[in-house]
Design a protein with these regions (language model features):
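Flexible loop/turn segments at secondary-structure boundaries
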Residues: 23, 33-34, 70-71, 79-80, ...
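Solvent-exposed coil/turn segments that connect beta secondary-structure elements
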Residues: 19, 30-32, 66, 77, ...
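Append "and occasionally in soluble cytosolic enzymes with long acidic Gly/Pro-rich linkers
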Residues: 51-181
C-alpha cells in the first residue's frame, strides 16, 4: 500500500508520468441483465434506464464524482491526484499544430454548454468535480425525468471485485460523494460486491453487450499505437 511504501522510503518517493492507460466510469445505456441488482421492481429498472438516457443526469453524475477521493483509497491522499486523467485519449498523446490534443479538445467543449467553459483537461488534477454544477444539472434532469413519470431515488448498480479491497473502498467513496452531493433521496449507489469471476463476466470480460450486468462501471483502456483512433 502507499502508506507502507511511504513509511519505508519516506523522502525518496518520486512520481513518474502517467502511461497510455486511461480509466473511466461508463454507463450501461441498454441494460438487459439483472442478476446482480438491488432493484426490486420493474419500475425501478425503468426509472434508472430512463435516467441514464438523460444527458443532464449523466452530466450530474460526472460533475458529482470526486475522483481525487476515489484515487486516494488506493494511492493515499498525497498521491491521489497523480493518477487522474480527464480524457480517454491522453491529453498529450498527439499534437495538433502547436497545441496538444487535450488543449484542442478543451477549446471545443464550450460548444456543448457554458458549464464546460474553462475546463482544464491536463493530467494529474480533477477537471470535473464541482458540487454546484452537479446539483444544477441534477435539478434540470429531475424536472425532465419527473415529466416522464420517473420515480426517485434513482438506483445505480455499480459492480466491484469483492477481493480487491482498494476497489471496494473506492466504490464506497463514490457512493458517499454522490449521495452527499446529490442527496440520497435523489440517487442511491448500490455497490454490488461480486466474486472475481462474476465481476469479470458482467463487466470487462462480458461475452456480449447483453451480459453487462450493471448501470455504472469503472473500466479502462490502453492504446496500441500512436494515433487517437486507437482509443
Amino acid at each position: 500500500s502507499y502508506a507502507k511504501t511511504k513509511e519505508k522510503y519516506q523522502d525518496n518517493i518520486v512520481y513518474s508520468l502517467q502511461d497510455k492507460t486511461s480509466w473511466y466510469f461508463n454507463f450501461n445505456v441498454n441494460r438487459k441483465t439483472y442478476n446482480h441488482t438491488t432493484k426490486t421492481t420493474d419500475e425501478q429498472k425503468k426509472s434508472t434506464q430512463t435516467a441514464i438516457l438523460n444527458k443532464n443526469f449523466r452530466q450530474a453524475i460526472n460533475f458529482g464524482i470526486d475522483r481525487t477521493a476515489y484515487s486516494a483509497q488506493s494511492n493515499g491522499e498525497e498521491a491521489a491526484s497523480k493518477t487522474l486523467r480527464n480524457t480517454l485519449v491522453p491529453p498529450t498523446f498527439v499534437q495538433v499544430g502547436d497545441k496538444t490534443f487535450g488543449e484542442v479538445t478543451a477549446s471545443k467543449l464550450v460548444n456543448y454548454g457554458t458549464e464546460w467553459s474553462g475546463i482544464n483537461l491536463a493530467d494529474a488534477q480533477d477537471a470535473y468535480f464541482n458540487k454546484e454544477k452537479a446539483q444544477a444539472k441534477f435539478a434540470e434532469a429531475k424536472k425532465e425525468l419527473e415529466a416522464q413519470g420517473v420515480t426517485f431515488p434513482i438506483h445505480l448498480d455499480v459492480p466491484v471485485d469483492q477481493t480487491n479491497k482498494n476497489a471496494v473502498s473506492g466504490m464506497n467513496s463514490v457512493k458517499q460523494t454522490l449521495e452527499t452531493v446529490l442527496g440520497s433521496d435523489n440517487i442511491v449507489i448500490d455497490v454490488q460486491q461480486l466474486s472475481t469471476d462474476d465481476f469479470g463476466n458482467v463487466a470487462f470480460l462480458a461475452p456480449n453487450p447483453a451480459a453487462r450486468d450493471y448501470d455504472l462501471n469503472f473500466d479502462g483502456w490502453v492504446g496500441d499505437y500512436q494515433d487517437p483512433s486507437t482509443y
